[in-house]
């Protein structure tokens, strides 16, 4: 019985007007952070694809030791 009383009190607390506004604000911030993080990951993966598809750099110029 104590559990159900605690659950109903908790539900009453979370459905009060101020708390629902607060929870919506926190949820909105979390969604914005998630979208920003996904965009960041997408940009990084696209940058890596461009870098990986570039042709390899030529070997450094070396002077040969034989004189002909």
From Swiss-Prot:
Keyword annotations from UniProtKB, A to Z: Host membrane, Membrane, Transmembrane, Transmembrane helix
GO cellular component entries: host cell membrane; membrane
Topology within the bilayer: Single-pass membrane protein
Transmembrane portions of the chain: 21-41
Domain of life (superkingdom): Viruses
Keyword flag Oxidoreductase: no
Main localization category: host cell
Cellular compartment(s): Host membrane
The keyword Transmembrane helix belongs to this UniProt entry's keyword annotation: yes
Family: Belongs to the asfivirus KP93L family.
Any further remark recorded for this protein: Encoded by inverted terminal repeats (ITR).
Protein known as: Uncharacterized membrane protein KP93L
